[in-house]
Regions:
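Conserved acidic segment of CheY-like receiver
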Residues: 11-21, 61
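Short, charged/polar "capping" segments at the starts of alpha-helices
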Residues: 22-26, 70-71
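Short hydrophobic/Thr-rich beta-strand motif most characteristic of the beta2 strand and flanking loop
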Residues: 37-44
Length: 122
């Protein structure tokens, strides 16, 4: 599973930026199980940047462990320029890596972050 769209009409969204399909599936399911949250996966920078531009109510981008430092830096720069209200979760870097810690960090970020997403057309 690469994506889960919550049936809740105002569900916040998380973009998962990773390299491994099996782990992406596990983390999408973890986000789904938080309840009332949508999850969208991205395997490449291009896909990540497209998700940042189009995902509704984007609140958090989660970097997987396989994302190298240079790609993380480019992603952070893109977020700063295009979605400055979106926060970054970095399991294994910002906090100890475990599903329980990922869920706890996402819950905290989703509770604290303002809604964000693509700018509506004018």
């Amino acid at each position: 599973m690469k994506e889960y769209v919550s049936p809740a009409p105002d569900a916040p969204s998380v973009v998962l930026y990773g390299r491994t399909a099996a782990r992406m599936d596990e983390v999408v399911r973890l986000v789904r199980d938080l309840g009332g949250v949508s999850a969208y996966g991205a395997f490449t920078e291009e896909e990540l940047f497209a998700r940042i531009a189009t995902v509704p109510r984007l609140r958090v981008v989660l970097f997987g462990g396989g994302i190298d430092a240079a790609s993380r830096a480019r992603a952070r720069a893109h977020l700063a320029a295009h979605a400055p209200d979106v926060t970054v979760s970095e399991p294994g870097f910002g906090y100890p890596y475990s599903d329980a810690n990922i869920a706890a960090d996402l819950r905290a970020r989703l509770a604290a972050a303002p809604p964000s997403g693509p700018t509506p057309p004018r």
